[in-house]
Each structure stands twice: as C-alpha cells, then as structure tokens.
C-alpha cells in the first residue's frame, strides 16, 4: 500500500516538523539521484533528451557539492535563527537564482512565473508539496526531479519571504 505524505489542511504543511521532513526527503533524493553518474551516461536517451532541452542542470543544483547537501541537512536539525538565515541565504544565492534563470523560467507558463516570482498562490504550492509520494522516489526520472526542484524553489521562497530582503 502506497503512502502519500498526507497533510490535513494546507496550512499545517508549514509547521516546523512537516516542512523539515519534506525538505530533508527532497534534498536526500536529489543528492542521491544526481550523485549517480551512471544515470547521466551518454548512452541514456532520456538524459540526452533532457540535457538537449534544458542544458546540464546538475551543476546548478548540487552535482558533487557536499556543502549544499550538508547545509540542507543542517537546516532540518535544530539550529539558531542566525544559522538558518545563513543556510537559506547560501541556498538562495548559490542555487535557486541560477536554477530559476536557467532551468525554471524557460519551462514555466506565465501563470507559473507569476506564482513563483511572488509566491502569490501559497495554497497551490502547499497542495503540490502535500501530495509528494516518498515511497516511490527510486522511480523518479529527470523530469520528476525538475518538477520537484520547482517546488523546492517555491518552498524556499515561501520560507524566505519575511526573513530576507534580497
């Protein structure tokens, strides 16, 4: 029986425990997937097609950047507000800005761009995150990872909107 990360109401997603659980699972899976270089073989048609469409996005997200993985995992542990600020700012500056510019904007509709730029539609974002199925992560492909990266970006934007003046 498959288990979906079920949230009673969308607003409950933003409590500390649920937010950190989702963040940690997403980060762990992205790190695992991107570190498996065999998936990115020149003989893999799915990878070739994705790379031709969107470029080699791995270096924009994690690739072999252990600092990124460590910072994200640290975010899921108890840390001071100052440390969390540093983590969020690092992720925003080093990863989310280039991911948005290079990977996300070219594949977003105008409605998506409006939603992501201002996080205007928080209900939509919370609904998407609440339906992620963490039991079948091993079946996710490049497009799934790209879609989750979009949610990941939005999730951090939501967390940061009242914390940083960027």
UniProtKB/Swiss-Prot annotation:
PTM: Myristoylated.
GO cellular component terms, semicolon-separated: host cell cytoplasm
Classification lineage: Viruses, Varidnaviria, Bamfordvirae, Nucleocytoviricota, Pokkesviricetes
Induction per the UniProt record: Expressed in the intermediate phase of the viral replicative cycle.
Any single Pfam family the record assigns to this protein: E7R
Keywords, in A-Z order: Host cytoplasm, Lipoprotein, Myristate
Listed name of the protein: Protein OPG069
Annotated family: Belongs to the orthopoxvirus OPG069 family.
Localization, UniProt: Host cytoplasm
UniProt main location, coarse: host cell
Domain of life of the native organism: Viruses
Keyword Cell inner membrane: no
The species this protein was found in: Monkeypox virus
Gene: OPG069
